[in-house]
Amino acid sequence: SSVGSVLKSKVVCYNFGEAGAEQTDKQVGTEEYEDSVIPEIYFMDESVSVAVGDHSFAVYEGGQVPVKKREIQVGQEIRSSFHTEKYIGFVLLNQEKSGYEVRLYNKAGKQVMNRAFTGEYSNVQMVGDEIIMYEGSACCIITKAGVPRFKGDLKIDALLMVPAAGFNKYLVMSTNELRAIYLAK
């Protein structure tokens, strides 16, 4: 919403069980964010959830009544986000030099990895210990420690890419096939 010329986003937590039974409209929590858009909210597990803004994110804890535990200002524009049960990750527009930056945080909101990279990838996911980024046939894989594993051309336009059993083996799904590939540096 916008009040005057100030942009505001509101995160509302509902509980349709016993904890929300006595609350108006089952609302058990509300948090307003000024001058920020919150386009994504997800659960990492049954008691930790994350609200992602355009320049920050907030970690909430509590299964029945989520409470904001910390809010982290990222300091750069968040282009995309990804997560696992252990990590919160972002692709950021790198303001210091051309290109982008991938940044990884643990559930507590502590930064654990930061790595600059070039290229634009609209698909970003974390599977196991790897951050897999791809767009068309271009691909970049970085480990959770920030070590580049692969950057190159897959020779197939990927709609989905996941690790498979075997060393450097991945399954790549395109519009008309599922292909097993082995990546070499």
Per-segment meaning from a language model:
Residues V6-Y33, G53-V74, E96-F117, A138-K155, ...:
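Surface-exposed loop/turn elements that mediate protein-protein interactions on large endomembrane-trafficking
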Residues V28-E46, Q73-E85, A116-D129, I156-K169:
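Repeated scaffold domains used in trafficking and secretory/extracellular systems
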